[in-house]
Curated annotation (Swiss-Prot):
This is Large ribosomal subunit protein bL19m. Component of the mitochondrial ribosome large subunit (39S) which comprises a 16S rRNA and about 50 distinct proteins. Belongs to the bacterial ribosomal protein bL19 family. GO terms for cellular component: mitochondrial inner membrane; mitochondrial large ribosomal subunit. GO terms for molecular function: structural constituent of ribosome. It is found in: Mitochondrion. GO terms for biological process: translation. SUPFAM superfamilies: Translation proteins SH3-like domain. It comes from Bos taurus (Bovine). Residues 39-68 are annotated as: Disordered. The lineage of its organism: Eukaryota, Metazoa, Chordata, Craniata, Vertebrata.
Length: 292
């Protein structure tokens, strides 16, 4: 019995080296390999870095270089600048505070003479207690709280103009349907032009405008009705650029109008109104009101 047990132990000792040699030939498991790679001094390779995994390229940034980019500029509404000759600007400083408080309630967008606007006002006698009017801005005038703008449209063949007070509490909304400029700072001569130049659909849809672009300038020149006109628009003091005078006046009439020219006024530096310092002070007031 003892001899058989001794022979069994010797056989087991002989099988030990054979098992160790067979284990060395087996492939290393994945868990063991990951522990080896994640050892000290090595980073563990996981995720999309493994070979055979697709990595999408970064999204390209497309820059439109077809047109000039608009510079980042701040728009200061012209009614903020006080008229020339005021030595004590206290009145306009107090008015600017009221104007800034009003702008916190009503959004007054950027617009120019020549832009098409839609204005919604409170009207106790209209259906829905509100009324709308759409038209082209032909004039901006006034300073401070007295700033006004005139909209013109032709309705059923009749020219209609409405003068709105910019800071009137009855105004509920001012929408810019089409933002653009014209060749002149005043378009009052549209009263004497053909009706087609001041006719717009009351249900006109807003035209999208990219904020990075410059405000476009409409180079349109209108055709006038036969004389008489409300004013002598051909005279140099009006400096009108948006009228086709060659279609309504003769050469003799144009020469006669040039007799009223005053070419020396172009070189009169005292007529220039430098508002750079005033604009800087006004912008400081605007920034202070925003932070308060």
């Amino acid at each position: 019995m003892a001899a058989s047990i001794a022979r069994g132990c010797q056989a087991a000792k002989g099988l030990g080296p054979s098992f160790r040699s067979a284990r060395a030939l087996l492939p290393v498991s994945t868990s063991v390999a990951s522990r080896v790679l994640a050892g000290p001094g090595r980073r563990q390779i996981t995720g999309p870095s493994e070979p055979g995994v697709f990595q999408p390229p970064p999204k390209p940034v497309i820059v439109d270089k077809r047109g000039p980019q608009r510079r980042e500029s701040r728009f200061l509404s012209p009614e903020f600048i006080p008229p020339r000759g005021r030595t004590n600007p206290l009145k306009f400083q107090i008015e600017r505070k009221d104007m800034l408080e009003r702008r916190k309630i009503l959004h007054i967008p950027e617009f120019y003479v020549g832009s098409i606007l839609r204005v919604t006002t409170a009207d106790p006698y209209a259906n829905g207690k509100t009324s709308q009017f759409l038209g082209i801005c032909i004039q901006r005038s006034g300073k401070g709280l007295g700033a006004t703008f005139i909209l013109r449209n032709t309705i059923e063949g009749q020219g209609v103009e409405i003068c709105f007070e910019l800071y009137n509490p009855r105004i509920q909304e001012i929408q810019v349907v089409k933002l653009e400029k014209r060749l002149d700072d005043s378009l009052l001569y549209l009263r004497d032009a053909l009706p087609e130049y001041s006719t717009f659909d009351m249900n006109m849809k807003p035209v999208a405008q990219e904020p990075s672009r410059e405000v476009p300038i409409n180079q349109l020149k209108v055709k006038m009705k036969p004389k008489p006109w409300s004013k002598r628009w051909e005279r140099p003091k009006f400096n009108v650029k948006g009228i086709r005078f060659d279609l309504c006046l003769t050469e003799e009439q144009m020469k006669e109008a040039q007799k009223w020219s005053q070419p020396w006024l172009e070189f009169d530096m005292m007529r220039e109104y430098d508002t750079s310092k005033i604009e800087t002070a006004i912008w400081n007031e605007i920034e202070a009101s925003k932070s308060s």
